[in-house]
Regions:
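Elongated, amphipathic alpha-helical interaction scaffolds
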Residues: 1-205
Length: 205
């Protein structure tokens, strides 16, 4: 466990060094399969003096070209209410980045990436993705999609005449990524695996 604590604090230094932004953008881009440009950090309870402080984590906020926000967190001490804290963190960012008089379409899309170095629930895999899906109770294969007008207004999609958007209503809602680093115990087969291996062992192959 001592190795992970050292690496957690090394990541804190990495996050706060603007010269290393490309490294983190590479990790985020690999995970989400799209380009993100880091714009600013979230300064919160992450500035602790001890590895065992209550909020032992690394937080920063990144923004892409579309104005979407991403929260990045590292946690190496077990916490029973971790899922609740993730939910709170996303909710807080949503409310922090909208003004009182703004219309609801100004609510930002938020991604939450969480790297954990402890057993989380009954996890067997090492990467989990969570998102909101609206499906019909009477027609479970019917996934609720946006209208063409909503798709254009919210995502800037250009839809040809006669076509319907493939955007789901759930695409408006936050998405969550959980990287259970300790569950990774195999050879890296793709770029994402190489990142997980790096997060676990601190070595670049």
């Amino acid at each position: 466990m001592k190795h992970y604590i050292r690496f957690d604090w090394a990541m804190k230094r990495l996050l706060r060094n603007k010269a290393n932004h490309a490294v983190l953008e590479g990790l985020i881009g690999t995970l989400l399969n799209e380009k993100f440009i880091i714009k600013r950090f979230l300064e919160s309870e992450s500035n602790q003096q001890s590895e065992n402080d209550k909020f032992n984590r690394v937080d920063f906020l990144a923004e892409n070209e579309k104005g979407e926000l991403i929260i990045f967190e590292i946690q190496n001490t077990r916490e029973l209410t971790y899922f609740h804290r993730i939910l709170y963190g996303v909710s807080k960012v949503i409310t922090d980045y909208i003004d009182l008089g703004d219309d609801y379409d100004k609510v930002r899309k938020v991604y939450s990436i969480n790297i954990v170095y402890f057993s989380l629930g009954q996890a067997k895999d090492y990467v989990y993705h969570g998102k909101t899906v609206f499906y019909g109770l009477h027609e479970p294969h019917d996934i609720l999609k946006l209208s063409n007008k909503q798709s254009k207004a919210f995502f800037g999609d250009n839809i040809e005449n006669g076509e319907k958007t493939k955007r789901e209503a759930g695409d408006v809602f936050p998405e969550y990524y959980l990287l259970c680093v300790n569950n990774f115990d195999k050879l890296a087969k793709n770029n994402l695996d190489e990142w997980i291996d790096f997060l676990k062992n601190g070595k670049i192959k």
